[in-house]
Amino acid sequence: MTTNIAAAGVQAGQDQAAPSPLVDFIKDFKCNRGAVIGLAVMVVVTLAALLAPWIAPHDPLLQDRDHMLTAPVWTSGQWTYILGTDEAGRDILSRLVFGARMSLLIGITSVLFALVPGVVLGLLAAFFPQKAGPLIMRLMDIMMALPSLLLAVAVMAVLGPGVLNAMIAIAIVTLPGYVRLTRASAMIELERDYVTASRMAGAGLLRLMFVAVLPNCMAPLLIHATLSFSNAILDIAALGFLGLGVQPPTPEWGTMLASARDYITSAWWVVTMPGLTILASVLSINLMGDGLRDALDPRLKRIS
């Protein structure tokens, strides 16, 4: 009787000492101060994008011809236009808030457009290394040999400007990274004993791919998706600056930069505000990606 009670006490102590993976992840993520700051900034940006119709002080398309190129409020401006106005008299703050909706939407959608086929192609390359693998990987090598922005511009030249085409172009540019990462992770997992046991138990190909192997490859994929999200925001801003992305007068950060490039010296705020917004968003997402890597990578945990 005493032995059973002691064993139960030891088991209870072990259960209390071993936190759940979610609790362990949150604890490790919170230890990275930069990641927490990046998460806070992106929460603010996301809330601003979702609540844009209610928190934006003005219509982003409304033109006030009497207040064109009005300076920000802290430099002899007025409180009606806190961050000033652009060359058409449109409120910069309102356009930044509404532009966040477009940038985040395109970023998230392009990541999903690249993630899903990238995972499928990567798994096919890992499970069929003699047949489909070489063909898929050589195609990815050719795509990676081209500069990403040049490839995106080439795709946009074929498809034409527009929001959907910009999403497709960015997804094509980021696709090889997902394929290579999925293939590498899956090939490591294929050597594990649990995969052999699943095969001996009669698991089919699809079950092996998406039930046995894929869940164990998600950690590096999530980290890569986070970093690709920041690259997607940069790419859509670059395409908008070149006139191939979101078309005026729709508010989008890159398009705002393109329309303001003639006023860099005379009205610095027209260029500085969207530029700082892009910088803060991309930096915050990269900090979040570093935090996810530190929290999800078991090798880094062993080193620490």
Predicted segments, located by residue:
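Residue-level signal for helical boundary/lining positions with a hydrophobic bias
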Residues: 28, 55, 82-85, 263, ...
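Membrane-topology segments of multi-pass transport proteins
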Residues: 1-31, 62-90, 304
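Short acidic (Asp/Glu) and glycine-rich catalytic loops that position anionic groups and cofactors
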Residues: 1-5, 46, 238-239
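Residue-level marker of positions within ordered structural domains that often coincide
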Residues: 34, 52, 74, 187, ...
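N-terminal signal-anchor/first transmembrane alpha helix
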Residues: 13-61, 139, 217-218
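Hydrophobic alpha-helical transmembrane segments of membrane transport/permease proteins
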Residues: 40, 48-85, 242-250
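Alpha-helical transmembrane segments of integral membrane proteins
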Residues: 87-304
